[in-house]
Amino acid sequence: MIKPILRQIISYLSISCILILLFSCVNKSNTNKDHLVFRYNEHANINTLDPAFSRTLQDTWVCNQLFNGLVQLDSDLNILPSIAKDWIISEDGLIYTFNLRNDIYFHKHKLFGKDSTRTVVARDFTYSLNRLKDEKIAAPGSWVLNKVDSFKAVNDTVFEISLKQPFPAFIGLLSMKYCSVIPREVAEFYGTDFRSHPIGTGPFKLKRW
């Protein structure tokens, strides 16, 4: 009579230990990933996660976490490199030549194929900024590029912007989130729905909204 009871006790303890170990592993796994997740609550409505349309403070704040441009501002409003590691302005103030970093990748997406990602190259800026200017897109941030004559991808890491006339404040305008780089293949795949399926280069990738 004692042996069956002992067997039951041993079986119960064994199952309990296994369950405890399983739950411990799950909890440990979740805990290890928690530091990689940024949860954000916004009291105002977010209208879009497409940087070309991010005209409100709440839209811009979120897009700041998802996208990058050629340059950025620090807390003292100094212009600093971002994807462009440096730049040269011609003596006549008409041509801005940007040397791009070659280690910046887009967030992972199936449209990128086998590796699920790819590096940002100059033609991505040509596409992104031409899209911003496109009257058919009707982006509210298009005014930022009113002084621009053309964009040119010299090669993968050299990008040129030609102005219609000298405009010293132009480099500062490029720090606005409107001028973020986006991947053409993803933007064209989603169309207007890119606003809720953003793929950029920022420190965070959108999980859900």
Language model segments and positions:
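Solvent-exposed coil/turn segments that connect beta secondary-structure elements
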Residues: H43-I46, S54, S75-D76, D92-L94, ...
